[in-house]
């Protein structure tokens, strides 16, 4: 990179430092969670629009995702502060405490955030509590199993190497793909997307089933 590029990056870094200090850090973490969750939903909706001709972008859906993400930001901010005070650790010498933090995060924060996500979106979108709870029962274990596949390794890196003030920002940086998955899990349409009178990909149907049945009867 030319010297001018390095100077520009250093200037950008210096300008951004106040966002990660004092009370501004809480605002940064809160808005970061909301923006990344909305961006993940936007990416998912873009894919859905390509896969389903006629579907239009739903801005209210992304706004709901933004609101839920912002509501999670303060929790994550104080959650990591609490974990760091409870189990202080730095680098590989602190690995035992780091592993404790990863385990507690998976057993406490992850399921809590899953419940928060489904019930929060259900509330914002006008679902009844019974319907939201049923959706949570239907999808929670799928969410939680996927969570165990992704986040323990990510949090291990987070607690080992990332400075405390950047922990939520680091997580936000990784969550674009994860939030896209969460949007898919929340809004997916069950079953194959096939028009009436057709069948799933890989089979051939030349006439509707009712017509074939009528022919047999005749």
Curated annotation (Swiss-Prot):
The chain crosses the membrane at residues 20-42, 63-83, 102-122. It holds the Pfam family Mpv17_PMP22. GO terms for cellular component: cytoplasm; mitochondrial inner membrane; mitochondrion. InterPro entries: Mpv17_PMP22 (IPR007248). It is a multi-pass membrane protein. The keyword Nucleotidyltransferase does not apply. Its main location: membrane. It is found in: Membrane; Mitochondrion inner membrane. The keyword Nucleotide-binding does not apply. One of its GO terms (biological process) is positive regulation of mitochondrial translation. Required for the assembly and stability of the mitochondrial ribosome. Is a positive regulator of mitochondrial protein synthesis. Interacts with the large mitochondrial ribosomal subunit. Belongs to the peroxisomal membrane protein PXMP2/4 family. This is Mpv17-like protein 2. It comes from Bos taurus. The gene is MPV17L2.
């Amino acid at each position: 990179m030319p010297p001018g590029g390095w100077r520009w990056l250093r200037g950008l870094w210096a300008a951004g430092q106040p966002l990660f200090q004092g009370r501004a850090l809480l605002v940064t973490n809160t808005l970061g969670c909301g923006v990344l969750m909305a961006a993940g939903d936007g990416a998912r909706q873009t894919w859905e629009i390509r896969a389903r001709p006629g579907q239009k972008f739903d801005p209210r859906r992304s706004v709901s995702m933004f609101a839920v993400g912002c509501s999670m930001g303060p929790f994550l901010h104080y959650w990591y502060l609490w974990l760091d005070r409870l189990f202080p650790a730095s680098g590989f010498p602190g690995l035992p405490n780091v592993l404790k933090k990863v385990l507690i995060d998976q057993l406490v924060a992850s399921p809590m955030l899953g419940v928060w996500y489904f019930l929060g979106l259900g509330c914002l979108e006008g679902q009844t509590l019974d319907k939201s709870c049923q959706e949570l029962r239907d999808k929670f274990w799928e969410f939680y199993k996927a969570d165990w596949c992704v986040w323990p390794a990510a949090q291990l890196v987070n607690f080992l190497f990332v400075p405390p003030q950047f922990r939520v920002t680091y997580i936000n940086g990784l969550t674009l793909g994860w939030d896209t998955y969460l949007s898919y899990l929340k809004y997916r349409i069950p079953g194959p997307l096939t028009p009436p009178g057709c069948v799933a990909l890989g089979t051939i149907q030349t006439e509707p089933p009712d017509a074939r049945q009528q022919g047999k009867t005749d």
